[in-house]
């Protein structure tokens, strides 16, 4: 059985999320999975509706989120990441479908974010493992 993935990718910090997208696609292919649909959203905070749309589809086995939340002048990164992570988990449970977190942050610098682009690979691997095991 070929595993079909949906990607939800934040456009904010696109220099980072583009690298992450490429790594995620490459790793999906390596694992024998297919990226069936990709939805770009403005930022991590905007992901839940796109995730929900993909979770509703019968032809998508799991959803992979890709984003990067970088520390700013305020605690905004903390708020964004906490709410996004919670909603991602809620949607996974609501639809009984793996939704994995490929979003490093919060509290990291741009340099640290560059060092963590491999989170996309981790999220793809987690999605594939969960589909196979559940």
Curated annotation (Swiss-Prot):
Organism: Methanosarcina acetivorans (strain ATCC 35395 / DSM 2834 / JCM 12185 / C2A)
Record-level GO BP terms: riboflavin biosynthetic process
Residues engaged in binding 5-amino-6-(D-ribitylamino)uracil: 12, 44-46, 68-70, 101
Gene Ontology CC terms: cytoplasm; riboflavin synthase complex
Presence of keyword rRNA processing: no
Active site residues according to the UniProt entry: 76
Stated name of the protein: 6,7-dimethyl-8-ribityllumazine synthase
Family the entry assigns: Belongs to the DMRL synthase family.
Superkingdom: Archaea
Any Pfam family the entry gives: DMRL_synthase
């Amino acid at each position: 059985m070929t595993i079909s993935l949906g990607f939800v990718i934040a456009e904010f910090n696109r220099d980072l999320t583009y690298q992450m997208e490429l790594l995620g696609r490459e790793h999906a292919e390596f694992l024998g999975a297919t990226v069936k649909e990709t939805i770009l959203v403005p930022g991590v905070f905007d992901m839940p509706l796109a995730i929900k749309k993909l979770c509703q589809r019968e032809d998508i086995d799991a959803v992979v989120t890709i984003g990067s939340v970088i520390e700013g002048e305020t605690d905004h990164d903390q708020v964004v990441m906490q709410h996004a992570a919670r909603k991602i988990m809620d949607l996974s449970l609501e639809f009984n479908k793996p939704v994995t977190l490929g979003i490093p942050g919060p509290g990291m610098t741009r340099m640290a974010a560059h060092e963590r682009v491999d989170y996309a690979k981790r999220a793809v691997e987690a999605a594939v493992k969960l589909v196979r095991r559940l």
